[in-house]
């Protein structure tokens, strides 16, 4: 069956109304949970093969997050799927107004390779809860994980309802040539532009979860020991292959040396004296990215790190960096942290705001005025004060970007809303019919109209 037939089969199935019943949605979420738990061993093995992820990191950053999202959404789907009563203006008396949630239809979820299980499955949870049919396209760069997900889904779901299309660029293009009712894409800006262009032909709404160069600021009031540990965690988790990882560092000149020493100490504590020999240290996804990252390091001064072998690059801190340095011209997506110092916060803000809006921003400070200044003057998707990356691991806030770092947000209720169209409905009583809206227009009715509409 070719891709056009796969997508049409889903449109035909959605048209039957089979996905509208909330009981059926809940049953589908339950089947997904059971399948993930059944396949957890194979998922672990696949992520070990693709990225050298340990079972601990796989559960913390992939499987556990999906199961948590399933639990949260499963408990609330029935309530979210009900009509929502809203007030009605006096001018429309006697009426009842409500918003009726309906699924978009057939949605395409395109996932990346860096967290290949979590970033594929979390959007799917929201799409299923909202009553959609789903076509999932995982990344060809993580083939073992893609294969396990395809097997899991094929064994668990009717392919008319939820199916996986494996493959590379040819399959991506073939999918984007089809008419979907919603497209959810996670990846880079280059492909995102292709997705938007293809979606525009059908006026298909999209969510774009992208990336960018996310700054981290450490000011002179920060708790340096805490900042260093949390910065090292957020930057070097998954070998820096995290879309919201700190991409570059601004540290106040007065605490620069202390922070550097603490960062190096924490890297040793996390990964040992030789991180490249650490069994739990994640590898770079492929040789193309391995060579690209080494090219960004070449010619720069490494305070620590810089070693590379067998597809791994050690956690690396660079100094002597300026805004014109090659490494500051693109998202790094690797375990390399360029560092710049500052004395004037206004200069840092001017630097960040002169560049495309980042997916995340991280600020380490104990000064409330500094916190408010940065949050109010810098636009970014989301972030943390006195921590890194953990803002994405909550169902109570949307995760997403702004500007070049993306559009739309998801997690928890925001995932349900992303894949839901809310129909605005007004139901009018028959026993009362105010006359002023009808022709012929009279002076008396005009006065009444002005009483209601002002």
Label each region the model flagged.
Residues 217, 268, 309-454:
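Conserved C-terminal structural/oligomerization subdomain of aldehyde/semialdehyde dehydrogenase
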Residues 1-98:
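N-terminal Rossmann-like NAD(P)+-binding subdomain of aldehyde/semialdehyde dehydrogenases
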Residues 6-8, 207-210, 238-243, 274-276, ...:
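Short, flexible turn/loop "capping" segments at secondary-structure junctions
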Residues 3, 22, 40, 224, ...:
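Residues at or immediately preceding the N-termini of alpha-helices
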Residues 14, 18, 33-36, 40, ...:
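Structural signal for hydrophobic packing residues in well-ordered secondary-structure cores
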């Amino acid at each position: 069956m070719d891709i056009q037939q796969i997508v049409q089969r889903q449109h035909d199935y959605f048209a039957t109304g089979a996905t509208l019943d909330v009981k059926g949605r809940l049953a589908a979420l339950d089947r997904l949970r059971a399948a993930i738990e059944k396949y957890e061993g194979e998922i672990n093995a696949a992520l070990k093969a693709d990225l050298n992820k340990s079972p601990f990191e796989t559960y913390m950053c992939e499987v556990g997050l999906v199961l948590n999202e399933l639990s949260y959404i499963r408990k609330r789907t029935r309530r979210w799927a009900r009509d929502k009563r809203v007030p009605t203006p006096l001018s429309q008396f006697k009426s009842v107004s409500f918003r009726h949630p309906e699924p978009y239809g057939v949605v395409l979820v395109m996932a990346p390779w860096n967290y290949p299980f979590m970033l594929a499955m979390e959007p799917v949870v929201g799409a299923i809860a909202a009553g959609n049919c789903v076509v999932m396209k995982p990344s060809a760069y993580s083939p073992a994980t893609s294969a396990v997900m395809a097997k899991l889904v094929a064994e668990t779901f009717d392919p008319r309802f939820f199916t996986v299309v494996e493959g590379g660029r040819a399959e991506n293009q073939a999918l984007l040539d089809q008419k979907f009712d919603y497209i959810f894409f996670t990846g880079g800006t280059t492909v995102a532009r292709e997705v938007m262009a293809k979606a525009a032909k059908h006026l298909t709404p999209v969510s774009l979860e992208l990336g960018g160069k996310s700054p981290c600021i450490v000011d002179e009031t920060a708790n340096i020991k805490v900042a260093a540990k949390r910065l090292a965690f957020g930057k070097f988790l998954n070998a820096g292959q995290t879309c919201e990882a700190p991409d570059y560092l601004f540290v106040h000149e007065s605490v620069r040396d202390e922070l550097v020493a603490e960062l190096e100490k924490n890297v040793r504590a996390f990964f040992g004296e030789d991180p490249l020999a650490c069994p739990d240290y994640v590898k770079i996804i492929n040789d193309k990215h391995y060579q690209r990252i080494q090219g960004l390091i070449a010619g720069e001064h490494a305070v620590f790190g810089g070693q590379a072998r067998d597809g791994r690059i050690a956690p690396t801190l660079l100094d002597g960096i300026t805004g014109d340095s090659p490494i500051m011209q693109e998202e790094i997506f690797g375990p390399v942290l360029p560092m710049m110092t500052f004395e004037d916060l206004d200069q840092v803000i001017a630097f960040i705001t002169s560049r495309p809006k980042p997916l995340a921003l991280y600020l380490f400070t104990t000064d409330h005025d500094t916190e408010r200044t940065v949050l109010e003057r810098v636009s970014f998707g989301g972030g943390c004060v006195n921590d890194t990356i953990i803002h994405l691991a909550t169902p109570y806030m949307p995760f997403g970007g702004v500007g070049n770092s993306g559009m739309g947000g998801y997690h928890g209720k925001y995932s349900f809303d992303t894949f839901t169209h809310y129909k605005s409905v007004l139901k009018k009583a028959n026993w009362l019919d105010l006359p002023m809206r009808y022709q012929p227009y009279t002076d008396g009715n005009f006065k009444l109209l002005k009483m209601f509409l002002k």
